[in-house]
């Protein structure tokens, strides 16, 4: 059984991210060949947010994504279940909350937008998390999910698969404090639903008008959806 096929016990996932927190941002930049910065900017651009609005950045890790979202002028809060990840990002001056994505400590409809970047894949019951995100979003509000996906070009897909399964673990051994975490990363990406399947899941969990935009040839996809106005 692959690591990605495991039950993703929250305690194990938290322990894994706690273990990689210290060098997490550096490792991600190296392993993505610097594309992580582009993906964060694209996520911010996909959100229709500005001053006076409230945004929840879920699975925010060290809050590097939250800091990018804050450039919009909106009030953005970073939430993650790894306290060590949040503490590692302590220098980033955004509010931070330790939270379980399936049981968020927020009232109904308090956010104008919710985003989650490269975190949905790590949640055992990600459909429950999507429903929770819908609960805390106001009617007419929006969701943006930035996640690894399925390359649309066969050549890109072949090269990417080779990188994931061969090169990435080797590079991770050089730059990460826990290389096994990045073997899990590679396997979980391969096991993750494609663009169409994830869009269908959004429709089934309280979100309307799901759509997506491929980034870097479909290696990453930005899925967006709206909270229905009742």
UniProtKB/Swiss-Prot annotation:
Record pathway: Quinol/quinone metabolism; menaquinone biosynthesis; menaquinol from 1,4-dihydroxy-2-naphthoate: step 2/2
Which PROSITE patterns does the entry link to? SAM_MT_UBIE, UBIE_1, UBIE_2
An example Gene Ontology biological process: menaquinone biosynthetic process
Which keywords has UniProt assigned to this entry?
A: Menaquinone biosynthesis, Methyltransferase, S-adenosyl-L-methionine, Transferase
Q: Where does S-adenosyl-L-methionine bind?
A: 62, 80, 100-101, 117
EC id: 2.1.1.163
> By its UniProt entry, which Gene3D superfamilies does this protein fall under?
Vaccinia Virus protein VP39
Reaction(s) the record says it catalyses: a 2-demethylmenaquinol + S-adenosyl-L-methionine = a menaquinol + S-adenosyl-L-homocysteine + H(+)
Q: Which residues form a coiled coil?
A: none
Task: State any single GO MF term.
Answer: demethylmenaquinone methyltransferase activity
Q: Which InterPro entries match?
A: SAM-dependent_MTases_sf, UbiE/COQ5_MeTrFase, UbiE/COQ5_MeTrFase_CS
Looking up SUPFAM superfamilies in the UniProt record yields:
S-adenosyl-L-methionine-dependent methyltransferases (SSF53335)
Q: According to the UniProt record, what class of enzyme is this?
A: transferase
| Classification via Pfam families | Ubie_methyltran (PF01209)
UniProt lists the family membership as follows: Belongs to the class I-like SAM-binding methyltransferase superfamily. MenG/UbiE family.
Q: Which HAMAP family match?
A: MenG_UbiE_methyltr
Q: Describe the task this protein carries out.
A: Methyltransferase required for the conversion of demethylmenaquinol (DMKH2) to menaquinol (MKH2).
Q: Can you name this protein?
A: Demethylmenaquinone methyltransferase
Q: What is the lineage of its organism?
A: Bacteria, Bacillati, Actinomycetota, Actinomycetes, Mycobacteriales
């Amino acid at each position: 059984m692959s690591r990605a096929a495991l039950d993703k016990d929250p305690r194990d996932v938290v322990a894994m991210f706690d273990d990689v927190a210290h060098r997490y941002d550096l490792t991600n930049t190296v392993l993505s060949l610097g594309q992580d910065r582009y993906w964060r900017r694209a996520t911010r651009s996909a959100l229709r947010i500005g001053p006076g609005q409230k945004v929840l950045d879920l699975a925010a890790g060290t809050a590097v994504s939250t800091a990018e979202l804050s450039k919009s002028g909106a009030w953005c809060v970073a939430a993650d279940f790894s306290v060590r990840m949040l503490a590692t990002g302590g220098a980033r001056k955004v509010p931070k909350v330790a939270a379980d994505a399936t049981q968020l400590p927020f009232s109904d409809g308090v956010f104008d937008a919710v985003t989650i970047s490269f975190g949905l894949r790590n949640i055992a019951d990600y459909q429950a998390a999507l429903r929770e995100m819908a609960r805390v979003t106001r009617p007419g509000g929006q969701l943006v999910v930035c996640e690894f996906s399925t390359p649309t070009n066969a050549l890109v897909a072949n090269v990417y698969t080779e990188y994931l399964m061969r090169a990435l673990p080797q590079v991770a051994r050089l730059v990460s404090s826990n290389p096994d975490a990045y073997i899990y990363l590679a396997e979980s990406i391969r096991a993750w639903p494609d663009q169409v399947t994830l869009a269908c899941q959004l429709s089934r969990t309280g979100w309307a008008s799901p759509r997506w935009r491929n980034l870097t040839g479909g290696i990453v996809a930005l899925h967006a959806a709206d909270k229905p106005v009742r």
